[in-house]
Every structure is written in structure tokens, then in C-alpha cells.
Amino acid sequence: MKLIYLFSVLGLLYACNTTHKLNDNVIDENIEFAYKQIGNEIQAIEKSGKFMNPVTLGKDGRTYYCKYTDWRSGFFPGSIWYLYELSGDPKLLPVAQKYTQALKEAQYLTWHHDIGFIINNSYGNGYRLTGDTTYRSVILQAAKS
């Protein structure tokens, strides 16, 4: 009976350890995939000479972009901030800052009920990760608007 108990516990411990390794691999693979996707978008935007925020892929495979007034405009800078946080890659910091800065005028959108999506994903994450008080100022102004 003790032998059965011992093997059961050992089997359980082994299974738990394997799962963590598999989960870690899946997480790492997804971070790597996100890094490539965001890198591809940044290259496409830079190549176009226009400053745009990607929001979706169409059925035709084209990337669709939006202006800073669109409720989804903060998601791309926010994704860069999250990737910066997950990867620790210092090269992503100026990129996240650049795409966040492009939304600065959104803080004055008094007619927009989705201002939180725009500002918190971009400026909120920037402030959370850097402590830069200029981000805080934009967040507070958006709250007043």
C-alpha cells in the first residue's frame, strides 16, 4: 500500500512539473509570435511613410488602420507596452513611447465615451511601466475631458 502511495505521489509531481514546462513553452512561443507580428506591423507602417495604428486584418489579408479618435487606437501602443513588459527588450521602449505619443491629442476628446480604451491602454501602461509623470498628466486631462 505504501508503495502505491509513493508511486502515486511521484507520478503526480512529475505530471505537475511537465505541465509547467509545457505551459512555459507555449507562453514563450506566443510572446515570440506577438513580437514578430508587432515587428511586422511596425515595419509596414514605417515603410508606408504614414503614421497609423493597425486595428484588424480583413478577409482579404489587408491590415486596416484607424485614426487617433477611433476607440481602438490605443490597443496597438498598449500591445507594444505589454510586449515590452513581457520580453524586457529595451528596444521596444522608444517604439511604445512613439506610438503612445501619437495619441496625445485624444486627451482632449470631450465627445468620446471610449476615451478610457484609447488613453489607458497607451498612456496608462506607459505610466505604469515607466513612472513618467507626463503620461500621468495626459491621463488626468483625459479624465477631465
Where are these regions (language model features)?
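Alpha-helical junction/boundary sensor with strong preference for TPR arrays
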Residues: I45, S87, A106-T110, T130
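Bacterial Sec-dependent N-terminal signal peptides
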Residues: M1-N25
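General structural concept
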Residues: A102-K104
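Low-complexity, Ser/Thr/Pro/Gly-enriched N-terminal "stalk/linker" regions
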Residues: H20-G74, Y82, L86, P90-Q97, ...
